[in-house]
């Protein structure tokens, strides 16, 4: 062709040179315009209101919400397991488990690539079972690829320290912490745990477990604060405050108040079984700890596995909306437990399929789903079908986004390895773990003052038992830690008494598969020793999930020692050599033979990474034991209802062929010194129903050692419109006393400590006579008593 012809609105024909010049100018202008648009888009993204850290959180939430698609909104209600957990379990499971098992988080039909894509598409809000900083950062990088760059919440079961992660501090479990009656310590441990979690780029702990544990068969007693509503309430509230701080720094994490409600009081003592309980018992026993933690600012609440009076907790509108939000003013978000919404289909049979179960749960008040592959698609469909309004979805998403802004995750989605290494397992935290362990160990028996040991007298000591030299001492919700980070009982003994010859006979770690030959060997060695230490109890380590005898989903039909442990104790004790039994367990055990025949018994619960040192310090008198039982120790499973705060008629008819009294009562614990309570008096003997009074008692350390006594105040309403407990804990204090020292201790008796739900289910203080009791345990014989008249 000789020329190019262009015609524009009748204009003249231009030459090739003119046209080429025109095209170059046009392309250049277009490129400048495109660059300008791109820069403007980047600039506008950078200056979006929701990304402005100076803007009020409420405005940031609304701005972000307005930009989200329905798919992205539902994604904010979606939690999945971490990629490494997913990959590891998928590879290790059998074909049958892959097809049927939900507990190990295998998602049939999904791959790691699918999870990564969902995350980078903004369809995942949170992950759990992420155990390393590297994976947490990698998941956040995926989230930052999403359109709106909404950061993830990383959740973990940091029940007693962030113990599922390597090199993090492992404190005593909650049942031991409760036995210290040390509320400030609970707060401190939670603060330190929060710091270690944030150093691992984790933001949400599934704790405190504020269920009141009344049944020792239930495997999760160890993660609770015991059987008393008042003690559980104070420990749970302090723990909640400790985790959260002000929820505005990189030292704060979200608490998760769980499990709401009734899981600790199932009909057969098994996890997830039905709970059938009156509203009166709910409000008097099980609700107070939840209410206090919620009103302390608890940011999240987890529902309980079970059905409550026929209605699954995960679809229970009365619990989620009426009680939590309307009565208690809960502003945070509610999360399901491990695929428990789906269990409405295959366990409770209250929904025909998962989609229907999701509908029921969301309409009842659920905000976030833990965990499972079907949630995203099904919930989006429910909205598009008009069965759930978008505004209902917005309610949940607002609550979830609010916490992410509070925690500063939009500004700080990553954490460096340098910051992690500076914080985790630091000297201050390790010192706290050791001190907490010392204060959590209960001395149950000490005939003829066998303890503390005189190292010059007992030069050759046999140490044996499944818990003598095993990391199981850390307790449930722990993963294996480097050996140099954990002090077992054997290590602790050798550390504290290096001049003693300790001979160790290993019984293995598994109580169900103990060797008769090893028991025989230990008995033979016991005959040659000056003294014997037997470390028994239960096995709790989660990496051997199917081998545990205590912990989550590890419930029992009896409370006896498992396997050959009783034989080991009996035969060693029968050698005639002084014998000490050390129990390491997450639940109260029925050690009847030992209680009658073994001269010294220590109940160490699950004392954490320095438990062995703390036990050894008590054995050799470096530390004077002070802990008191946070849970009654029954004689058998038939005595599970012998909690101290029973109703008066509970034992009107005594049992035959046995005893009505427990092995050791709530609040019980010995010391190497003795204490005397005297002169219990009230600041007024008569008060009005809206008035307060003070109860004062004198406590004297009558022994020759310094010590700490846990003074306890109980109250009974003598005559009331409804049947009331024989006593209820309403005050306690840790009292440090030098040998020979006396101190006056004062307890406040306020109207709320006298109030109860009357015959009309109204909380009130009824006029009449109250009995005030103060002493060193809940046992009547240990209590001083006086009367208070309320007009």
Where are these regions (language model features)?
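Extended hydrophobic alpha-helices typical of membrane-associated regions
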Residues: 785-787
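Glycoside hydrolase catalytic-domain context in secreted enzymes
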Residues: 17, 39-755, 766-780, 789
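Bacterial Sec-dependent N-terminal signal peptides
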Residues: 1-46
């Amino acid at each position: 062709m000789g020329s190019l012809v262009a015609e524009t609105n009748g204009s003249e024909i231009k030459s090739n040179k003119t046209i080429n010049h025109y095209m170059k100018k046009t392309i250049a202008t277009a490129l400048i315009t495109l660059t300008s648009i791109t820069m403007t888009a980047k600039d506008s993204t950078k200056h979006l209101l929701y990304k402005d850290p100076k803007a009020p959180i409420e405005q940031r939430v609304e701005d972000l919400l307005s930009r989200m698609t329905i798919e992205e909104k539902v994604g904010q209600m979606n939690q999945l397991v971490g990629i490494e957990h997913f990959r590891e379990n998928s590879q290790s499971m059998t074909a049958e488990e892959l097809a049927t098992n939900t507990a190990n988080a295998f998602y049939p039909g999904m791959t790691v690539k699918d999870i990564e894509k969902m995350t980078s598409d903004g369809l995942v809000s949170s992950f759990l079972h992420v155990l390393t900083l590297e994976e947490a950062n990698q998941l956040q990088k995926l989230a930052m690829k999403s359109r709106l760059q909404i950061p993830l919440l990383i959740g973990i079961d940091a029940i007693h320290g962030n113990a599922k992660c390597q090199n993090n501090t492992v404190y005593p479990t909650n049942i031991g912490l409760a036995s210290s009656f040390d509320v400030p310590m609970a707060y401190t441990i939670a603060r330190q745990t929060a710091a270690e979690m944030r150093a691992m780029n984790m933001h949400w702990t599934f704790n405190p477990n504020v269920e009141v544990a009344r049944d020792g068969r239930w495997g999760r007693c160890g993660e609770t604060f015991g059987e008393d509503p008042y003690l559980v309430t104070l420990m749970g509230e302090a723990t909640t405050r400790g985790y959260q701080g002000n929820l505005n720094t990189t030292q704060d994490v979200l608490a998760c108040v769980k499990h709401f409600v009734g899981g600790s009081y199932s009909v057969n003592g098994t996890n997830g079984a039905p709970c059938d309980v009156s509203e009166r018992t709910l409000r008097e026993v099980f609700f107070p700890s939840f209410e206090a933690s919620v009103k302390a600012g608890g940011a999240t609440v987890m529902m309980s596995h079970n059905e409550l009076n026929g209605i699954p907790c995960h679809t229970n509108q009365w619990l989620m909306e009426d009680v939590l939000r309307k009565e208690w003013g809960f502003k945070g978000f509610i999360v399901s437990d491990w695929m428990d919404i789906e269990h409405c289909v295959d366990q409770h049979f209250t929904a025909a399929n998962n989609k229907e179960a999701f509908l029921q749960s969301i309409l009842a008040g659920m905000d976030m789903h833990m965990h499972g592959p079907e949630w995203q698609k099904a919930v989006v469909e429910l909205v598009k079908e008009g069965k759930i309004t978008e505004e209902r979805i917005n309610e949940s998403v607002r609550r979830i986004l609010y916490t992410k802004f509070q925690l500063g995750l939009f500004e700080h989605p990553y954490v460096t390895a340098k910051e992690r290494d500076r914080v985790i397992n630091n000297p201050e935290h390790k010192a706290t773990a050791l001190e907490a362990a010392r204060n959590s160990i209960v001395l149950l028996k000490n005939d003829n003052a066998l303890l503390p040991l005189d190292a010059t007298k007992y030069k050759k000591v046999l140490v044996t038992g499944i818990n003598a030299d095993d990391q199981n001492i850390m307790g449930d919700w722990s993963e294996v830690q480097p050996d140099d980070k954990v002090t077992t009982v054997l290590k602790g003994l050798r550390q504290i008494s290096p001049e003693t010859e300790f001979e160790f006979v290993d019984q293995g770690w598994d109580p169900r598969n103990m060797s008769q030959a090893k028991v025989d060997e230990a008995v033979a060695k016991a005959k040659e020793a000056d003294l014997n230490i037997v470390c028994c109890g239960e096995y709790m380590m989660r990496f051997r999930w199917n081998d545990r005898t205590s912990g989550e989903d590890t419930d029992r039909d009896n409370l006896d020692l498992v396997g050959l442990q009783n034989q080991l104790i009996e035969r060693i004790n029968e050698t005639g050599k002084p014998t000490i039994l050390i129990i390491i367990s997450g639940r109260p055990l029925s050690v009847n033979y030992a209680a009658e025949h073994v001269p010294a018994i220590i109940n160490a619960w699950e004392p954490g990474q320095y438990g062995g040192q703390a036990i050894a310090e008590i054995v050799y008198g470096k530390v004077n034991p002070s802990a008191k039982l946070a849970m009654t120790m029954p004689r058998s499973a038939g005595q599970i209802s012998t909690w101290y705060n029973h109703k008066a008629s509970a034992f009107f008819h005594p049992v035959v062929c046995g005893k009505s009294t427990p092995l050791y009562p709530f609040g019980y614990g010995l010391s190497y010194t003795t204490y005397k309570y005297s002169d219990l008096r009230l600041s007024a003997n008569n008060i009005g129903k809206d008035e307060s009074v003070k109860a004062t008692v004198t406590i004297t350390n009558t022994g020759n050692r310094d010590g700490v006594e846990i003074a306890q105040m109980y109250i009974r309403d003598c005559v009331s419109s409804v049947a009331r407990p024989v006593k209820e804990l309403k005050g306690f204090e840790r009292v440090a006393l030098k040998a020979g020292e006396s101190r006056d201790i004062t307890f406040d008796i306020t109207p709320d400590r006298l109030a109860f739900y009357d015959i009309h289910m109204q909380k009130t203080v009824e006029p009449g006579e109250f009995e005030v009791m103060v002493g060193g345990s809940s046992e009547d014989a240990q209590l001083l008593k006086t009367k208070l008249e309320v007009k």
